Amino acid sequence: MASHIIGNRNSTPDASKSSLRPPSSSRNLGSHQLRASADMSGFPSPLSSRSIRPSSEVYYSQQSQAQNNAEDPLDRAAQQWLADIDQYETTLEEMAAATLDQDFKDELSAIEQWFRVLSEAERTAALYALLQQTTQVQIRFFIQVLQQMAKSHPMSGLLSPANFSEKDAMSNRLNDAMSKLNIDSSRNSLGRPPPSPGAKRNSGLDSSTINAMFPDAAAAIAKKKAEFTQQTGNAPPSNRNSAVYGDRSSLVAPTISAPDNTDNLGQPPASPWAQRGNEPQPPIARPKSSSGQQPMGQFSQASSGLRSPLPTQTATITAPEIEAPLLSPYNVGNASWASMTNTPMTATFGQQVHQPPNSQADMVANATAMKLAALSTVNNRIALDDARKYRRARSNDGQGRSSNTNVNQTIQGGLASPGLPGANHLVAGQLLNAQQLAALQAQQQAAMAGRRSRPTSPGIAMQGGALAAMGFTSPQNNGFLAAYDPNNPLLGNGLGALGLSQFGLGGHEGYLSDHSEVTRGRSPRGRRGSSKPPEDPTDPNLLKDIPSWLRSLRLHKYTDNLKDLKWTELIELDDKALEERGVNALGARNKMLKVFEQVKEAKSEGKLDSIA
C-alpha cells in the first residue's frame, strides 16, 4: 500500500484510488502547467460575499431610509402645528369654564377694580410680574392673542403693519417651501386614529359662547387653522371631540428651543408627505408658536437656555406645615415682589403661632380633608388657601398685640372667607374650634347691631376674639366713615381701655358717620335714607357762610362750584343751572333743589328778613 503510493507520487492518481488531498500547487507548476493555469481554487469566489437580497434592493432601501430621515422634520412640524392648535383650543375652553365659576368671577372682578386704579407704569409692572409665572404653553398662547390684538388695533397700521411678517424674505422662503408640499398628490393621506373617548372635552360650552367671551383669542386660533389649511390643504381636525394623535395627555407641546424632542408626543401615523428625491430640502414654514426664529417685526421670546419652563404641577397634596403652607398663593418658591399687594405701611405678615404638634393634629387633619374634598369637586383645579388669610395687618391694629392682656393676636384664618371654617383660633389662651368661634362671632355681632346700618363687609367675616378684651371693633363695620364714629372704640371714650383718654385723644373733628350719635340720644346728623336735613338749612347764620352751609348738607365737595354765589342767588338755581355749575350727581341736585324750596318758604314767611 505504501509502495504503491510512493510509486504514484509524481503521476496522476489512479481512477480507482483517487486521493482526497488536493494537489500541491508547487508540484503542479512544474509538470502540469496547463492544469495549474485552469485551477481556480486559489481565487476567492466573487459571489462569496453576496447577501441574500440583491444589491439593487439594498441600494434603494438605503435611499428610501435617507428620504424618510429627511422628511422627519416635516412630520414633526405638522405634528407641532396641530398640537399647538389643539393646545390653544384647550386653553380657551378651560378659560371659559373657569370664567363661569361664580367664585372666580368675584375674585376676578375685585382684581379688575384694583387694576383700574393703577397708573400706566404700575399696570405694566404688574403685568410683567404676572408674566414671569407663565408656562411655555401660556407664553405661546399669549403671543398669538397679542399679535391678533395688535392687528385689530386702529394704530397697528401706522406702528406695525398687520401683514408685515408676510413681506419679509424669511416668510417668503418659508411660504415657498410649504407651497411645494401642496403639489403632492398624497397630501390628503394624513391618517389619524379614531376619536379617543378619554380625550373628549366635557365642558359643555358652545363654541359660539366661548368665542363671544374671548373674541381676540378665538380670532387668533381661527387664523392658525386658516394658515394650516392654506399651507397643507387639510383642515385641522375638530379637537373638541378627539385628540390629534392618540390621547390628549400625550400632546404636551415641547419647548420652543427643542423641537426635536418627540418623547412627549404619541406615535404618529405614516408621513403625510410623499417621498421625494434626495434634493436639498428647504426649511418648512413652521407656525410662529413653535419656530425658534421669529420673522422680522415680531417679538421674540427667550429660549430655554435663558429661562427654563416651570416644573409640571401635580394634584398630589400632602398635609401642609403651619409655618409654610403648601397651598398658599404666596408660596416662597414662587413668590415675587408683586405678590405682596400694594406697599405695606406695617409688617406684611404677622408671625404665626408655633404650637406643639399634638395640639395641631386636628387642625392639620381638618385642613387636609377640606383641601382633598375641594379637589374632588373641582375638576383639574387646585384649591388654594384663601388669599385673604395672608393679607397684611391693618395699620390701625398695629401688630395686634396688647401688653396688658394674655391674648395671642396672630389668629390663623382670622380673615378667612365667610362660609368656610378656618383653622382653630387661640383666644385668651384657649383653643377654639369653628363652632365656638362662630358663637363668639354671633355674640359680638349682636352687641354691635345697634350701631350698624348695613351688614359688615364680607372682606372681614370674622371678628378676632382677642380684640374684644380691648373693646376694638372692625373698621369696616360702619363702612369707610367708621373712623369718625365717636362710639368707635378706636376713638373717643373707647380709648379708655388703652389708658390714652387722659391725653385728650377722645375728641374728633370733621364729619360723623351715618350712625354717629344714635346711642347718646341725640338726633343723627344726616342719616342716609332720611329726607330730613341734618341741620336746619334755613338757619340765618349758616346762610351767611355758603361753604359752612354746604358742609352741613354734606355737599361740601361742590363748594368750589358755588362759593362765589350769595344765598339769594344760589336758591334761584334750577336743575339745569346746577348741572352747568358742575353738580353732576343727580342725587346732589335733587337734594339741593329740595333745600332751596325750604329756604324759599322760610324767606316768604319772613324768617330770613334779618339777613336779606
Curated annotation (Swiss-Prot):
InterPro entries: SAM (IPR001660), SAM/pointed_sf (IPR013761), SMAUG/VTS1_RNA-bind (IPR050897), VTS1_SAM (IPR037635)
Keywords: Cytoplasm, Nucleotide-binding, Protein transport, RNA-binding, Transport
Gene Ontology cellular component terms for the protein in this record: cytosol; P-body
GO MF entries: mRNA binding; nucleotide binding
Pfam families attached to this UniProt entry: SAM_2 (PF07647), Vts1 (PF25479)
Stretches assigned to the SAM domain: 541-602
Segments of skewed composition (Basic and acidic residues): 511-520
Main localization category: cytoplasm
Ranges where the record places region Disordered: 1-74, 184-209, 253-311, 391-411, 511-544
Domain of life of the source: Eukaryota
Cellular compartment(s): Cytoplasm, Cytosol; Cytoplasm, P-body
Compositionally biased tracts (Polar residues): 58-70, 288-311, 396-411
GO biological process: nuclear-transcribed mRNA poly(A) tail shortening; protein transport
Biased composition (Low complexity): 16-31, 44-56
Function: RNA-binding protein involved in post-transcriptional regulation through transcript degradation.
Subunit structure: Monomer. Binds to RNA.
Family: Belongs to the VTS1 family.
UniProt name for this protein: RNA-binding protein vts1
Organism: Aspergillus fumigatus (strain ATCC MYA-4609 / CBS 101355 / FGSC A1100 / Af293) (Neosartorya fumigata)
Source taxonomy: Eukaryota, Fungi, Dikarya, Ascomycota, Pezizomycotina
